[in-house]
């Protein structure tokens, strides 16, 4: 099911329990070490960086290394080196999710003790036969943790949320009401659990990321509510597509960002985000180019539609999905 199958825009919605204006802005970039950063990764990193710096906020980096089978040795250090090469320097220490297992287990135990989660032995094939959405079969079976996943008992489904770029988005009801997995059967911590705990613990006030993560947002907000955490605001940036119209990704073998002069690539990224460009951008120092971009950053003019990127980093745009 695509993102556009699960979400539509609506005209009115007021989100409760957000951080207030008195909180200092804290943003983040949270890549997984499954490969080097590519142009699509740069769009998310640059967009979140400019949004944070334009509000005199902090910009944190977190390595989401909770899925070892998908990780590539050395990718985390290369990602950090790439960010530095492109002038995107972060605040504070880099956080690694692999160091937070005890914290995740603490919250899992809390949810279980409070009756807010339960164990489930349903297989992926069974759920696929149901159309891809879990039906709550194990909700009242009182199963043990043996060879079982742990699911959130959904009590606060979120049917819509506000995106600062896209407006108000409405989720498919079956997605919003699903008891989703927070601890996998194979013992790994689910992405939705880890990201909510870490964003809360790091004091993240706004999440700026790619539009491919619109769908999990309602699940994450529901978990925020059940844990009584303050909910950050959200911005979902347009995706970069390859020439075949697919999302530029590590899984689709997107080429790594070049390690040559970063300025032409940054200018292409700014152009992709529909931002104004300095007349002498190629001649500016990297730090001056980024400072100029921070001063002229405007979220309101970022496009909604995905776009095709070419290998020469020109702006070949075409309409596409989020």
From Swiss-Prot:
GO biological process assignments: glutamyl-tRNA aminoacylation; tRNA modification
UniProt xrefs under SUPFAM superfamilies: Nucleotidylyl transferase
InterPro entries found in the cross-reference section: Glu-Q_tRNA(Asp)_Synthase (IPR022380), Glu/Gln-tRNA-synth (IPR000924), Glu/Gln-tRNA-synth_Ib_cat-dom (IPR020058), GluQ/Sye (IPR049940), Rossmann-like_a/b/a_fold (IPR014729)
Cofactor(s) of this protein: Zn(2+)
The protein's enzyme class: ligase
Residue positions binding ATP: 250
GO MF annotations, alphabetized: ATP binding; glutamate-tRNA ligase activity; zinc ion binding
Keywords on record: Aminoacyl-tRNA synthetase, ATP-binding, Ligase, Metal-binding, Nucleotide-binding, Zinc
Span(s) of short sequence motif 'HIGH' region: 31-41
Pfam families attached to this UniProt entry: tRNA-synt_1c
E.C. number(s) listed in UniProt: 6.1.1.-
GO cellular component: cytosol
Entry binding sites for Zn(2+): 120, 122, 134, 138
Extent of motif 'KMSKS' region: 247-251
Binding-site list for L-glutamate: 28-32, 64, 191, 209
Co-factor remark: Binds 1 zinc ion per subunit.
NCBIfam families with a match to the protein in the record: PRK05710.1-1, PRK05710.1-3, queuosine_YadB
HAMAP family: Glu_Q_tRNA_synth (MF_01428)
Entry function: Catalyzes the tRNA-independent activation of glutamate in presence of ATP and the subsequent transfer of glutamate onto a tRNA(Asp). Glutamate is transferred on the 2-amino-5-(4,5-dihydroxy-2-cyclopenten-1-yl) moiety of the queuosine in the wobble position of the QUC anticodon.
Family stated for the protein in its record: Belongs to the class-I aminoacyl-tRNA synthetase family. GluQ subfamily.
The protein's name: Glutamyl-Q tRNA(Asp) synthetase
Organism: Pectobacterium atrosepticum (strain SCRI 1043 / ATCC BAA-672)
Lineage: Bacteria, Pseudomonadati, Pseudomonadota, Gammaproteobacteria, Enterobacterales
């Amino acid at each position: 099911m695509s993102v556009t199958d699960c979400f539509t825009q609506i005209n009115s919605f007021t989100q409760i329990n957000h951080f207030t204006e008195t909180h200092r802005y804290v943003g983040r970039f949270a890549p997984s070490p499954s490969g080097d950063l590519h142009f699509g990764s740069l769009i998310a990193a640059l967009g979140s960086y400019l949004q944070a710096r334009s509000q005199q906020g902090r910009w944190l980096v977190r390595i989401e290394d909770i899925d070892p089978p998908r990780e590539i040795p050395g990718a985390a250090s290369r990602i950090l080196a790439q960010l530095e090469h492109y002038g995107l320097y972060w605040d504070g220490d880099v956080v690694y999710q692999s160091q937070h297992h005890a914290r995740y287990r603490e919250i899992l135990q809390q949810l279980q003790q409070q009756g807010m989660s339960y164990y489930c032995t349903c297989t992926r094939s069974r759920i696929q036969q149901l159309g891809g959405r879990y039906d709550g079969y194990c909700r009242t079976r009182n199963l043990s943790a043996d060879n079982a996943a742990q699911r959130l008992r959904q009590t606060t489904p979120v049917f819509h949320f506000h995106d600062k770029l896209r407006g108000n988005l409405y989720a498919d009801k079956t997605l919003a009401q699903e008891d989703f997995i927070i601890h996998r059967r194979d013992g790994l911590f689910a992405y939705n659990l880890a990201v909510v705990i870490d964003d809360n613990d790091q004091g993240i006030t706004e999440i700026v990321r790619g539009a491919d993560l619109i769908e999990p947002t309602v699940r994450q907000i529901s978990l925020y509510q059940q844990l009584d955490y303050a909910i950050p605001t959200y911005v979902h940036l347009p995706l970069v597509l390859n020439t075949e119209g697919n999302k530029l990704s590590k899984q689709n073998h997107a080429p790594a960002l070049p390690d040559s002069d970063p300025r032409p690539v940054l200018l292409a990224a700014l152009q992709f985000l529909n931002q104004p460009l300095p007349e002498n951008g190629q001649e500016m120092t990297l730090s001056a180019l980024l400072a100029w971009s921070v001063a002229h950053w405007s979220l309101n003019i970022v496009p909604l539609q995905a776009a095709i990127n070419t290998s020469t980093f020109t702006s070949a745009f075409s309409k596409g999905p989020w």
